[in-house]
Amino acid sequence: MADIFADNYSEDPYWWDLAPRPESDDQTPPSRADVVVVGSGNVGLSAALSLTRRGRDVVVLDAEAAGHGASTRNAGYLGRGLWFKYGDMVQSIGREGAGILAREAVRAHDYAAGLIRDEQITCFYRDTGRFIAAPSKAIYRKLEKDLELMRADGVPVDAEMIPAERQHEEIASTVYHGGQLLRGNGIIHAGLYHQGLVERVRAQGGKVIGFCPVTGISRENEGFTVTTPKGTIQAGEVFVATNGYTPKAFPWQRRRVIPVSAFMIATETLSPELMARVLPNGRPLIENRNTPLWIRPNEDGTRILFGGTTGEDLGSLPRKAHQLHGEMTRVVPDLEGVKLTHCWTGKVAFSFDMLPHTGTHDGVHYAMGWCAAGVPMGTYLGHKTALRIVGDPDAATPLDDRPFPTKPFYTGNPWFLRWAVAWLKHKDAKLMRE
């Protein structure tokens, strides 16, 4: 097996090089707070920032270091859509419902991009657009039909179809059959974005306490008692923002999200000539299929970040790195021989209906089920949850308190994932033959 690892190879996320995990606030949580936020990712921090700005005393708790989970492990895509493709969503919930949710996804993008701008968060945000690659002619036609349908339904979309003979403008690859150039999408440095949120929450007086897992919660009069190994907190409100890391202390929420491991690699520094050849426009790419691969430049355009094989557990990150390196060089042969400096993993979470969910259950607020669109939608719905907590009429969204399905006997351990991934790959293979 070829040596693909650079001397400085690490299994920490690439993003942590510039944004190490922040120090925790006082390790002993306060005895009281207006709001306890469980989960210190982008969702919880977005809520905490909006709450502290409205005069609430907020404590953010995490079982690990702040932002240890998906918020600093994701691909750093800031998109304008949902995982559920528009045509599929129309078939599932109808044209009116699909149009409403698609427009809400655009609002989520605009809110997150506006937050970066207004808060002056230095996270290398760039409005690059996105190339959605079609692995087959049938998928290209599906992308084309989806675009026509979105335009007919008045969904804000700025896109064009790129036929196979022009795809060299986007990527040095011949494995695709064209794709869709979707403008108005961006990329960020995931670690620095999260770091910026932590800094702003703390500047407003909010506490962010790591290594303090929530082990229990109970109703007490008009509020809650939140139990941790480091003491209890009397809270007026509780917001669960744990997504793929939801603990057993919240069984109702845990039963409704499916944690799925995703994997990424980062290459060594590449020459400007090679970077320009691989991604001529410096634009991120994601495949349009059920088990996609994705590729993007890093924050300064000197490396390639590549991800995929979501849900497939090979037992060790070095083995996963070899698999991803093989996929990367299959897609872009020019990257043959390039070594890796990082391979890492993190958990995304899917809902059973493939849609995000926000609402309140037994008095506890929640927002989760991002289905791999958590940077914009999570930031937005974290803010909207904060507005709901303070009673602001602008809190309402079409995602509030929608039926949040689960399955019989499911308790949060996705024992069925291997077979689900195999089925999705079978569906992809069928589409590839069409």
How would you name each of these model-derived features?
Residues 33-60:
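N-terminal Rossmann-like FAD-binding beta1-loop-alpha1 element of flavoenzymes
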Residues 53-73:
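Glycine-rich FAD pyrophosphate-binding loop
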Residues 73-104:
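Glycine-rich active-site loop/strand segments that organize a redox cofactor
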Residues 92-200:
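Rossmann-like flavin
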Residues 110, 118-126, 214-216, 232-362:
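Active-site substrate-recognition segment that forms the wall
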Residues 314-316, 321-429:
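C-terminal catalytic lobe of FAD-dependent flavoproteins
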